[in-house]
Amino acid sequence: MSDLLSRRLALLGAAANLPLLTECLHGIERECLRVDSDGKLALTPHPRALGSTLTHPQITTDYSEALLEFITPTETDVADTLADLERIHRFASSKLDGEYLWSPSMPCELPDEESIPIARYGSSLIGRLKYVYRKGLALRYGKTMQCIAGIHYNFSLPERLWPLLRQAEGSELSERDYQSAAYIALIRNFRRYSWLLMYLFGASPALDAGFLRGRPSQLERLDEHTLYLPYATSLRMSDLGYQNNAQAGLTPCYNDLQSYIDSLRQAVSTPYPPYEKVGTKQDGEWVQLNTNILQIENEYYSSIRPKRVTYTGERPVQALAARGVQYVEVRCLDINPFLPLGIDLDEARFLDAFLLFCAFSDSPLLNGECSDATDNFLAVVKEGRRPGLQLQRRGQPVELQVWANELLERIADTAALLDRARGGEAHAAALAAQRAKVADAELTPSAQVLKVMRERGESFEAFSLRQSREHAEYFRQHPLAAEEQARFEKMASDSLAEQTELERDQDGDFDTFVAAYQASILGLISN
């Protein structure tokens, strides 16, 4: 164990401080496509019975009208987070009217690009802005790529913990800056070690052959309708032939919060010639919010983000600049197609131990390690189960299995501390399950997906539809209690009323609204 990690764990293990570890906050966002009874993309509007996608706090859409997004409230116990997520699934399933929630991350058979419906948010200015932003994504990256679904894991350490560490370490930074620097250090370590999550939880080794739209790739054919890589863990997180040159130079290495903010500010205000050629309007219709490298900060694609809850009308980068980092959002997790929620308690508890390990371990600046971190991540998503696979650690080759076992040995200390804080051995058990996967790659979700498809002679689509139907049956057999169902019905109707009120009471025209939105980031830069 590193000196810094051991010192911090000893400090938090003291009787007076141990309860702090029960105050970490969790939230999960799960995306999933709606499909029809044949497993084709649902072309129906977002079900009105689920409420307004603009104003509902827990049920919205991501890119497409058919790409649902379920958002849990924050909880200190991740078991409560998963219970929240299950309630949302049960309610949504009860309103789908013959449609299913698609079980894996990679999409079903998709119609042609033009027919994939972009999510709609009504006629309010903010609703229209969200729609035009998505039109811009279609223009820049194509609609097909936007139909990939994932799980986002939001995690924060208790606010009371940072002053304790700051004082113990004699830091001269302000409390806010110390906290931000600590989260950025967590993110640097996440970049170093997130390949391990791809090995353990990657669950997208195969996809529907039509997804590539005929483009050449390194993928092999499993059957007439399925492409795969034999040792892949997460094709979702690989490049899959998508190279967006505009974002190529955008690689913040997270040396400090300010440099991260500056790189995003620059990207959302720097014109990109190919986008300038298109312009923001065609035939008088908006096609993208601006012609810059990024339309808004959230367009930047990354496996983890520093976050701060925003105020109404505030942009993410404004919130970070004004109040510092509050939590991290892990964005690289595949949906496990064998699980009704796409994630379970073992995975969540391991993630907690992993993120605490990243937060408390020494985290030097990445600098030269940046390219190694990227290369390791890409190697594992494409061939993580290849026997003897070598990764790069501080410029030296190391076998994945050796490095993974060393990391799990160190993460065991944070898992043990979490168990001491909460009682029981749940985190140690979650860690043991991951050790078993390192010892035997056949136990990983990616290997299990290929094993089942081969044993049953199923295409990716057939496997996924069967899993989707099984999960629908699970939710049907576990309906919400009447009181819970009524609470969700009210949330849906309240959100519709809120959207109606927003549309009725707004002032101003859309062009002025977009100009003001753009000016908010330009104002930040000039300050």
Swiss-Prot record:
GO terms, biological process: glutathione biosynthetic process
Highest taxon of the lineage: Bacteria
UniProt KW keywords: ATP-binding, Glutathione biosynthesis, Ligase, Nucleotide-binding
GO function terms (MF aspect): ATP binding; glutamate-cysteine ligase activity; metal ion binding
Keyword Nucleotide-binding tagged: yes
Pathway as given in its UniProt record: Sulfur metabolism; glutathione biosynthesis; glutathione from L-cysteine and L-glutamate: step 1/2
Gene3D superfamilies the UniProt entry points to: 3.30.590.20
Keyword Cytoplasm belongs to the record: no
Catalytic activity: L-cysteine + L-glutamate + ATP = gamma-L-glutamyl-L-cysteine + ADP + phosphate + H(+)
The EC number(s) this enzyme carries: 6.3.2.2
GO CC annotation: cytosol
Family the entry assigns: Belongs to the glutamate--cysteine ligase type 1 family. Type 1 subfamily.
UniProt-recorded name of the protein: Glutamate--cysteine ligase
Source organism of this protein record: Pseudomonas aeruginosa (strain LESB58)
